[in-house]
């Protein structure tokens, strides 16, 4: 940019002239020097009371675009004088003023904010898409919560022109709503999906990423057709994604439990691998954690690049980054390289005091599943955590209980209170899914036909794993037969490899078998393809294909029946 000297600033008390000078500098991309700026703010402050709405807006907007910070005294005078004329502002002045304040990081006073929402609400019907988008976006940057009445009017008026929104307006509006924690009305969301879908092909990487991330934060499930269009259109732009866009998009899909298509996944791994060297610690952690939550194993080449590149940033990881990364590797059944593990333990030890119960227990559980040797510093924290925070957190306590044998092998003997199992059983989630319920009806009938004297127990709490089994038969084997119905989350790569259950499912099976239980796992897709959902209630007949399948699965275990 060019520079302007003080001699080019005339000594004037003409408000219009001063505004025009600063606005002209902005249009010409000329940055005034510090001396010129100081003289400008002094002269401008004396004339603020004479500005009209557009001049107020243009002055602050030009300062923001030129990245010139007004002095505190000028800011105070600006808010005081502009507040008296807010009722005369038009839609562009409202939008640009708040947007400029956000860009400059200047917080308007409470009274000004209240007047802004009250006066701008009356003009919302005149707002264009950019005004709507920029105003809400500015509110998020300033962490200002619009009034409830303004929000209602915003949704009502913006809905009428959603068809005119461009990709950035769609993305920024939803992203801002998510940042503010404002849930759009159902009708608005319906129109949003309808109108934004045809324009997805025009979205840039940031618009794709921010839109999906916003839906995840708001817990809004996009329609199936919109999702399909999103994957199709975003796949072609993946090579333009930056690290945060890669990370946020996959993380949002995981939070929404939306499985990206296979081709999109392949393109994602290929393109993101090139960008791994530019990932920050949050990008590394969130990407691997999202892959684990979706049950998607990254390709070997990507994994190798991940370990190499992430190792250099481990010193910047926070407790959640450490915990989520190791937890994801365990779930994905990926064994980190020896050197990476050494650096991981060395760097994580420095932050152990900042681990919350969940981060601590997740890290411990992952280490157990991966059969990693714990460093001495981590070992010394185990008993302390059990005595303090973890005793109050049943999820973490359950993890500690299930890793007791692993810890004992490393020289750590945990002593649990007498009421530990009772506490864990009381807090166990015993909700039964539709699939489990229908499978239970079928198992009971098939078992009755095969061995009438053997009974099936539903929701049996197993002390050895401090968890509830879906079904249990006492008479099979040393301790009995545990039958688990495994949904999609138990499998990697969308369940396409039957032997490829996730790390935690495999660990639970080994744990039960070590303790003397027989274990039968029934995959969801094999039940579904054998018509399990045709069973309407407990009196309905078992579909022949399902009956044959269950008999085949039960037979080896029933030979052990006593």
Model feature map: region roles:
Residues 1-562:
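Eukaryotic RNA-binding helical-repeat scaffolds
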């Amino acid at each position: 940019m060019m520079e302007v000297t003080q001699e080019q600033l005339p000594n004037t008390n003409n408000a219009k002239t001063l505004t025009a000078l600063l606005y002209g500098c902005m249009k010409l991309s000329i940055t005034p020097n510090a001396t010129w700026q100081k003289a400008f703010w002094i002269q401008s402050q004396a004339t603020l009371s004479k500005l009209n709405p557009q001049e107020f807006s243009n002055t602050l907007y030009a300062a923001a675009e030129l990245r010139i910070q007004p002095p505190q005294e000028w800011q105070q005078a600006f808010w005081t004088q502009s507040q008296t004329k807010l009722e005369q502002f038009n839609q562009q002045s409202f939008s640009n003023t708040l947007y400029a304040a956000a860009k400059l990081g200047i917080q308007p006073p409470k009274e000004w904010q209240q007047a802004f929402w009250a006066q701008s609400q009356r003009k919302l019907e005149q707002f264009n898409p950019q005004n709507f988008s920029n105003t809400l976006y500015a509110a998020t940057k300033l962490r200002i919560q619009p009034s409830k009445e303004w929000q209602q009017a915003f949704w009502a008026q913006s809905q009428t022109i959603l068809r005119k929104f461009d990709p950035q307006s769609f993305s920024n509006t939803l992203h801002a709503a998510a940042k503010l924690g404002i849930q759009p009305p159902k009708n608005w969301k319906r129109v949003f999906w309808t109108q934004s879908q045809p324009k997805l092909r025009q979205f840039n990487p940031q618009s794709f990423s921010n839109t999906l991330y916003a839906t995840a934060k708001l817990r809004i499930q996009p329609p199936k057709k919109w999702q399909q269009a999103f994957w199709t259109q975003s796949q072609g732009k993946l090579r333009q994604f930056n690290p945060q866009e890669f990370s946020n998009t996959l993380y949002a899909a995981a939070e929404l439990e939306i499985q990206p298509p296979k081709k999109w996944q392949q393109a994602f791994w290929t393109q993101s691998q090139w960008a791994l060297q530019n990932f920050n610690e949050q990008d590394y952690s969130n990407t691997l954690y999202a892959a684990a939550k979706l049950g998607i194993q990254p390709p070997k080449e990507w994994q190798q690049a991940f370990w190499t590149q992430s190792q250099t940033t481990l010193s910047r990881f926070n407790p959640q980054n450490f915990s989520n990364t190791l937890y994801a590797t365990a779930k994905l059944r990926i064994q980190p390289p020896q050197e990476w593990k050494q650096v991981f333990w060395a760097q994580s030890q420095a932050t152990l005091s900042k681990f919350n119960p969940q981060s601590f227990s997740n890290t411990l559980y992952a280490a157990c599943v991966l059969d990693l040797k714990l460093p001495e510093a981590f070992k010394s924290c185990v008993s302390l955590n059990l005595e303090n925070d973890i005793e109050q957190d049943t999820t973490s306590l359950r993890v500690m209980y299930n890793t007791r044998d692993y810890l004992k092998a490393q020289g750590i003997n945990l002593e649990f209170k007498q009421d530990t199992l009772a506490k864990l059983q009381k807090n166990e989630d015993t909700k039964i899914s539709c699939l489990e319920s229908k499978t239970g009806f079928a198992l009971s009938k098939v078992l009755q036909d095969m061995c009438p004297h053997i009974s099936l127990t539903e929701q049996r709490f197993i002390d050895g794993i401090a968890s509830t089994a879906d079904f249990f038969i006492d008479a099979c084997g040393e301790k009995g037969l545990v039958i688990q119905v495994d949904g999609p989350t138990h499998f990697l790569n969308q369940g396409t490899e039957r032997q490829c259950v996730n790390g935690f499912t495999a660990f639970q099976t080994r744990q039960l078998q070590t303790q003397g239980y027989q274990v039968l796992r029934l995959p969801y897709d094999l039940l579904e393809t054998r018509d399990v959902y045709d069973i309407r209630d407990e009196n309905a007949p078992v579909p022949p294909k399902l009956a044959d399948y269950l008999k085949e699965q039960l037979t080896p275990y029933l030979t052990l029946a006593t």
